[in-house]
Amino acid sequence: AMNAGGKKAVLWGTALDNLAWWKMVDPDGNWLEVERLNHNFGKIHEQERVEFRLKRFDPSGQKLLSESVLSMPGASCRKTGLGKDVTDKFLGGLPGVQKEGTDGIIVAARWVLHKMPPISRTVCLEFFGQVREAVPAIVEITDYFKPGGAGHAAGVQLAGLEHLDERYVKAVGYATKAKRHGRPKMVLIGDIVGHDEKAVMSAASEVVRMCNLRAAEGFIAV
């Protein structure tokens, strides 16, 4: 199960965070069922310890061969700052989610599903200044919605944040929305969600204002 999640991973995590149970067949033809115990229904690294029950069955799927519990610190599943540790391919030996190689084929899975808040606004932010001045905006935006930030206090969340660098912008032939000549150095596309329309619009406007201070122009899709 690759560490997929798309831009909504900002709010709800990736595939690894939302797996509740999966069944796979190993190279010997035996069956393996993996169940996440005491799921926190959030990001895996935010849980102090994560546990998985592993049940192995014979090829018929009827005879239980072994049962064990795999336990590891939640923080070990994701590298601080980077978001994912590309150097850790093993992930504590958790079957089916290693980042390299194949230890089996997943044939069934159960997932944690999340309900999207009813109010959503998308902001498009185009940065025309130096890249070194634009990149800190990513941290400033995410901090605004974290606990302690004004966005979080208003009950508004950042559901997604997509980063397009200069090479990507050029490769896809990005059409600049601002009334400027040339393409931006960086583009951020964010989804801001909540239950109060006024609070969501206020947060979206504040994000645009923050980015205006970094030589960016912002647009809110209504």
Positions of PLM-derived features:
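C-terminal substrate-recognition/cap domain of FAD-linked oxidoreductases
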Residues: 99, 107-222
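FAD-binding subdomain of flavoenzyme oxidoreductases
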Residues: 1-139
